[in-house]
UniProtKB/Swiss-Prot annotation:
Alphabetized HAMAP family for the sequence: UPF0276
UniProt-listed InterPro entries: MbnB/TglH/ChrH (IPR007801), Xyl_isomerase-like_sf (IPR036237)
Family annotation (Gene3D superfamilies): Divalent-metal-dependent TIM barrel enzymes
A Pfam family of this chain: MbnB_TglH_ChrH
Species, as recorded: Vibrio parahaemolyticus serotype O3:K6 (strain RIMD 2210633)
Protein name: UPF0276 protein VP3015
Family: Belongs to the UPF0276 family.
Length: 288
Protein backbone atom coordinates (compact mmCIF):
# COMPACT_ATOMS: atom_id res chain seq x y z
CA UNK A 1 0.00 0.00 0.00
CA UNK A 2 1.17 3.53 -0.77
CA UNK A 3 2.53 5.54 2.15
CA UNK A 4 0.27 8.41 3.23
CA UNK A 5 1.03 11.28 5.58
CA UNK A 6 -1.97 11.60 7.88
CA UNK A 7 -2.50 14.25 10.53
CA UNK A 8 -3.62 12.66 13.84
CA UNK A 9 -6.90 14.61 13.73
CA UNK A 10 -7.96 13.22 10.34
CA UNK A 11 -10.24 10.20 9.96
CA UNK A 12 -12.48 8.62 7.34
CA UNK A 13 -15.93 7.11 7.33
CA UNK A 14 -15.74 3.32 7.56
CA UNK A 15 -18.14 1.73 5.06
CA UNK A 16 -18.90 -1.95 4.52
CA UNK A 17 -17.08 -2.27 1.13
CA UNK A 18 -13.86 -1.15 2.86
CA UNK A 19 -14.01 -3.41 5.92
CA UNK A 20 -11.67 -6.02 4.49
CA UNK A 21 -9.21 -3.36 3.33
CA UNK A 22 -8.96 -1.76 6.77
CA UNK A 23 -8.78 -5.13 8.45
CA UNK A 24 -5.89 -6.26 6.25
CA UNK A 25 -3.99 -3.07 5.37
CA UNK A 26 -4.47 -0.99 8.56
CA UNK A 27 -3.69 2.47 7.11
CA UNK A 28 -2.09 4.71 9.72
CA UNK A 29 -5.07 6.88 10.49
CA UNK A 30 -5.90 7.70 14.10
CA UNK A 31 -9.66 7.23 13.91
CA UNK A 32 -12.63 5.98 11.92
CA UNK A 33 -16.29 6.94 11.98
CA UNK A 34 -19.14 4.43 11.70
CA UNK A 35 -22.87 4.76 11.18
CA UNK A 36 -24.02 3.62 14.60
CA UNK A 37 -27.13 1.77 13.48
CA UNK A 38 -25.13 -0.54 11.21
CA UNK A 39 -23.40 -2.00 14.27
CA UNK A 40 -26.27 -2.46 16.72
CA UNK A 41 -26.39 -6.26 16.40
CA UNK A 42 -23.71 -7.63 18.76
CA UNK A 43 -23.25 -10.92 16.89
CA UNK A 44 -23.14 -9.49 13.35
CA UNK A 45 -19.99 -9.90 11.27
CA UNK A 46 -19.60 -6.11 11.03
CA UNK A 47 -19.52 -5.84 14.82
CA UNK A 48 -16.73 -8.42 15.00
CA UNK A 49 -14.73 -6.44 12.43
CA UNK A 50 -15.31 -3.32 14.51
CA UNK A 51 -13.98 -4.85 17.71
CA UNK A 52 -10.82 -5.90 15.88
CA UNK A 53 -10.33 -2.46 14.33
CA UNK A 54 -10.96 -0.81 17.70
CA UNK A 55 -7.66 -2.31 18.87
CA UNK A 56 -5.86 0.16 16.57
CA UNK A 57 -8.28 2.99 15.85
CA UNK A 58 -10.36 5.40 17.87
CA UNK A 59 -14.00 5.13 16.77
CA UNK A 60 -16.67 7.81 16.40
CA UNK A 61 -20.34 6.76 16.36
CA UNK A 62 -22.37 8.83 13.92
CA UNK A 63 -26.10 8.15 14.06
CA UNK A 64 -28.96 8.77 11.68
CA UNK A 65 -31.84 7.29 13.66
CA UNK A 66 -32.37 9.16 16.94
CA UNK A 67 -34.91 11.46 15.25
CA UNK A 68 -34.17 14.23 17.73
CA UNK A 69 -36.67 16.58 16.10
CA UNK A 70 -39.69 14.30 16.56
CA UNK A 71 -42.47 15.42 18.89
CA UNK A 72 -42.60 11.85 20.17
CA UNK A 73 -39.78 11.12 22.54
CA UNK A 74 -36.71 9.26 21.34
CA UNK A 75 -37.21 5.50 21.02
CA UNK A 76 -36.06 3.77 24.19
CA UNK A 77 -35.22 0.66 22.17
CA UNK A 78 -32.97 2.69 19.89
CA UNK A 79 -31.34 4.38 22.85
CA UNK A 80 -30.67 1.07 24.57
CA UNK A 81 -29.05 -0.33 21.43
CA UNK A 82 -26.92 2.78 21.06
CA UNK A 83 -25.81 2.65 24.68
CA UNK A 84 -24.87 -1.02 24.36
CA UNK A 85 -22.69 -0.16 21.36
CA UNK A 86 -21.11 2.75 23.24
CA UNK A 87 -20.39 0.55 26.25
CA UNK A 88 -18.80 -2.06 23.99
CA UNK A 89 -16.42 0.17 22.00
CA UNK A 90 -15.98 3.36 24.07
CA UNK A 91 -16.19 5.83 21.15
CA UNK A 92 -14.52 9.22 21.27
CA UNK A 93 -17.63 10.95 19.83
CA UNK A 94 -21.33 10.16 19.55
CA UNK A 95 -23.28 12.28 17.10
CA UNK A 96 -26.59 12.68 15.27
CA UNK A 97 -28.37 15.29 13.16
CA UNK A 98 -30.49 18.41 13.39
CA UNK A 99 -33.45 16.63 11.81
CA UNK A 100 -36.31 14.19 12.37
CA UNK A 101 -37.19 10.85 10.79
CA UNK A 102 -40.01 9.29 12.82
CA UNK A 103 -43.65 10.20 13.35
CA UNK A 104 -46.61 8.25 14.64
CA UNK A 105 -44.66 5.02 14.71
CA UNK A 106 -43.64 5.40 11.07
CA UNK A 107 -39.93 5.66 10.27
CA UNK A 108 -38.76 7.56 7.19
CA UNK A 109 -35.41 6.58 5.72
CA UNK A 110 -34.21 10.17 5.45
CA UNK A 111 -33.11 13.12 7.54
CA UNK A 112 -36.11 15.44 7.30
CA UNK A 113 -36.00 19.21 7.93
CA UNK A 114 -37.38 21.09 10.89
CA UNK A 115 -39.27 24.37 11.04
CA UNK A 116 -37.09 26.73 13.02
CA UNK A 117 -39.62 27.83 15.60
CA UNK A 118 -39.74 28.05 19.39
CA UNK A 119 -41.96 24.97 19.52
CA UNK A 120 -39.52 22.90 17.45
CA UNK A 121 -36.64 24.24 19.53
CA UNK A 122 -38.32 23.12 22.74
CA UNK A 123 -38.92 19.63 21.34
CA UNK A 124 -35.40 19.26 20.00
CA UNK A 125 -33.69 20.46 23.17
CA UNK A 126 -35.91 18.21 25.31
CA UNK A 127 -34.88 15.20 23.25
CA UNK A 128 -31.17 16.07 23.28
CA UNK A 129 -31.24 16.48 27.05
CA UNK A 130 -33.01 13.14 27.49
CA UNK A 131 -30.48 11.38 25.25
CA UNK A 132 -27.52 12.94 27.05
CA UNK A 133 -28.99 12.00 30.40
CA UNK A 134 -29.53 8.40 29.28
CA UNK A 135 -26.08 8.04 27.73
CA UNK A 136 -24.36 10.04 30.48
CA UNK A 137 -22.32 11.99 27.95
CA UNK A 138 -22.56 14.98 25.65
CA UNK A 139 -23.46 14.23 22.06
CA UNK A 140 -22.53 16.16 18.92
CA UNK A 141 -25.27 17.66 16.73
CA UNK A 142 -24.60 18.02 13.00
CA UNK A 143 -26.02 20.79 10.83
CA UNK A 144 -28.10 19.35 7.96
CA UNK A 145 -28.10 19.91 4.22
CA UNK A 146 -31.28 21.74 3.28
CA UNK A 147 -33.52 21.86 0.22
CA UNK A 148 -36.76 23.40 1.53
CA UNK A 149 -37.67 26.14 3.99
CA UNK A 150 -40.76 26.48 6.15
CA UNK A 151 -42.60 29.77 5.80
CA UNK A 152 -43.43 29.81 9.50
CA UNK A 153 -39.79 29.53 10.66
CA UNK A 154 -39.03 32.45 12.93
CA UNK A 155 -35.23 32.18 13.16
CA UNK A 156 -32.40 30.98 10.93
CA UNK A 157 -30.90 27.50 11.03
CA UNK A 158 -27.65 28.81 12.50
CA UNK A 159 -29.51 30.66 15.26
CA UNK A 160 -31.52 27.51 15.99
CA UNK A 161 -28.40 25.35 16.18
CA UNK A 162 -26.56 27.83 18.40
CA UNK A 163 -29.56 27.99 20.74
CA UNK A 164 -29.74 24.18 20.93
CA UNK A 165 -26.11 24.15 22.00
CA UNK A 166 -26.67 26.87 24.57
CA UNK A 167 -29.66 25.11 26.14
CA UNK A 168 -28.26 21.57 26.19
CA UNK A 169 -24.46 22.00 26.42
CA UNK A 170 -24.17 19.53 23.55
CA UNK A 171 -21.17 19.73 21.25
CA UNK A 172 -21.32 20.46 17.53
CA UNK A 173 -20.36 18.59 14.39
CA UNK A 174 -19.85 21.14 11.63
CA UNK A 175 -20.48 19.74 8.15
CA UNK A 176 -18.94 22.28 5.79
CA UNK A 177 -20.29 20.60 2.68
CA UNK A 178 -23.80 20.92 4.12
CA UNK A 179 -23.25 24.62 4.77
CA UNK A 180 -21.99 25.09 1.20
CA UNK A 181 -24.91 23.17 -0.33
CA UNK A 182 -27.57 24.89 1.78
CA UNK A 183 -26.07 28.32 1.13
CA UNK A 184 -26.50 27.83 -2.61
CA UNK A 185 -29.98 26.33 -2.34
CA UNK A 186 -31.29 29.10 -0.06
CA UNK A 187 -29.15 32.04 -1.14
CA UNK A 188 -27.30 32.89 2.06
CA UNK A 189 -23.60 33.56 2.64
CA UNK A 190 -21.60 30.69 4.14
CA UNK A 191 -19.70 33.15 6.31
CA UNK A 192 -22.95 34.38 7.86
CA UNK A 193 -23.66 30.83 8.99
CA UNK A 194 -20.14 30.02 10.15
CA UNK A 195 -19.65 33.23 12.10
CA UNK A 196 -22.82 32.52 14.10
CA UNK A 197 -21.80 29.02 15.18
CA UNK A 198 -19.91 28.94 18.52
CA UNK A 199 -16.57 27.68 17.22
CA UNK A 200 -15.31 26.61 20.63
CA UNK A 201 -18.19 24.10 20.80
CA UNK A 202 -17.24 22.43 17.50
CA UNK A 203 -15.47 19.11 18.12
CA UNK A 204 -15.61 17.65 14.62
CA UNK A 205 -15.79 18.75 10.99
CA UNK A 206 -17.21 16.71 8.10
CA UNK A 207 -16.00 17.11 4.53
CA UNK A 208 -17.73 15.45 1.57
CA UNK A 209 -18.75 15.94 -2.04
CA UNK A 210 -22.04 16.98 -3.62
CA UNK A 211 -23.83 16.69 -6.95
CA UNK A 212 -25.79 19.22 -9.00
CA UNK A 213 -29.25 18.39 -10.33
CA UNK A 214 -30.67 20.44 -13.17
CA UNK A 215 -34.29 21.54 -12.78
CA UNK A 216 -36.67 23.33 -15.13
CA UNK A 217 -36.02 26.63 -13.35
CA UNK A 218 -32.38 26.28 -12.42
CA UNK A 219 -30.45 23.77 -10.37
CA UNK A 220 -30.27 22.33 -6.89
CA UNK A 221 -27.18 21.12 -5.07
CA UNK A 222 -27.52 17.78 -3.29
CA UNK A 223 -25.37 16.48 -0.46
CA UNK A 224 -24.83 13.01 -1.93
CA UNK A 225 -21.44 12.14 -0.41
CA UNK A 226 -20.61 10.62 -3.78
CA UNK A 227 -17.82 12.84 -5.06
CA UNK A 228 -14.47 14.22 -3.92
CA UNK A 229 -14.56 17.29 -1.69
CA UNK A 230 -15.10 20.34 -3.91
CA UNK A 231 -12.56 23.13 -4.28
CA UNK A 232 -14.98 25.56 -2.63
CA UNK A 233 -15.43 23.34 0.43
CA UNK A 234 -11.66 22.89 0.77
CA UNK A 235 -11.40 26.69 0.81
CA UNK A 236 -14.10 26.94 3.47
CA UNK A 237 -12.27 24.35 5.54
CA UNK A 238 -8.92 26.08 5.22
CA UNK A 239 -10.44 29.43 6.16
CA UNK A 240 -12.27 27.94 9.17
CA UNK A 241 -9.28 26.14 10.68
CA UNK A 242 -7.03 29.14 10.05
CA UNK A 243 -9.51 31.30 11.96
CA UNK A 244 -10.57 28.92 14.74
CA UNK A 245 -7.90 26.23 14.91
CA UNK A 246 -7.69 22.51 14.09
CA UNK A 247 -10.50 20.05 14.73
CA UNK A 248 -11.04 16.35 14.25
CA UNK A 249 -11.83 16.14 10.55
CA UNK A 250 -13.66 13.38 8.70
CA UNK A 251 -13.83 12.53 5.01
CA UNK A 252 -17.29 11.11 4.20
CA UNK A 253 -18.17 9.04 1.12
CA UNK A 254 -21.46 7.11 1.18
CA UNK A 255 -22.61 6.62 -2.44
CA UNK A 256 -20.66 5.47 -5.49
CA UNK A 257 -18.01 4.41 -2.99
CA UNK A 258 -14.57 4.44 -4.64
CA UNK A 259 -11.46 2.39 -3.99
CA UNK A 260 -10.18 3.04 -0.45
CA UNK A 261 -7.08 4.72 -1.89
CA UNK A 262 -9.29 7.53 -3.23
CA UNK A 263 -10.70 8.11 0.25
CA UNK A 264 -7.24 8.07 1.79
CA UNK A 265 -5.98 10.60 -0.76
CA UNK A 266 -8.75 12.97 0.36
CA UNK A 267 -7.73 12.39 3.98
CA UNK A 268 -4.16 13.27 3.04
CA UNK A 269 -5.35 16.59 1.57
CA UNK A 270 -7.05 17.46 4.85
CA UNK A 271 -3.90 16.41 6.69
CA UNK A 272 -1.78 18.79 4.64
CA UNK A 273 -4.04 21.72 5.47
CA UNK A 274 -4.11 20.83 9.16
CA UNK A 275 -0.33 20.50 9.29
CA UNK A 276 -0.07 24.18 8.34
CA UNK A 277 -2.06 25.28 11.40
CA UNK A 278 0.10 26.16 14.39
CA UNK A 279 -2.65 26.70 16.98
CA UNK A 280 -2.92 23.55 19.14
CA UNK A 281 -6.29 21.85 19.48
CA UNK A 282 -6.33 22.37 23.24
CA UNK A 283 -6.12 26.13 22.79
CA UNK A 284 -9.20 26.24 20.56
CA UNK A 285 -11.66 24.51 22.87
CA UNK A 286 -12.79 26.59 25.82
CA UNK A 287 -14.36 25.09 28.87
CA UNK A 288 -18.04 24.32 28.36
Amino acid sequence: MKHYDFHPLVGVGLRTPHLDFFQQQRPELSWLEIHSENYFQPNAAERKYLHTLREQYQISCHGIGLSLGSVERVSQVHLAQLKALIDAIDPMFVSDHLSWSENGGHYFNDLLPLPYTEEALNVFTRNVLEVQDYLQREILIENPSSYVKFQHSTISEWEFLAEVQQRTSCRLLLDLNNVHVSAFNHGFDCNTYLSAIPADKVDEIHLAGFTIKQLDKGEIWIDTHSRPVSTEVWKLYQHWIEQYGPRHTLIEWDLDIPAPEVLLAEAEKASLLLSQITTPLSATRKAS
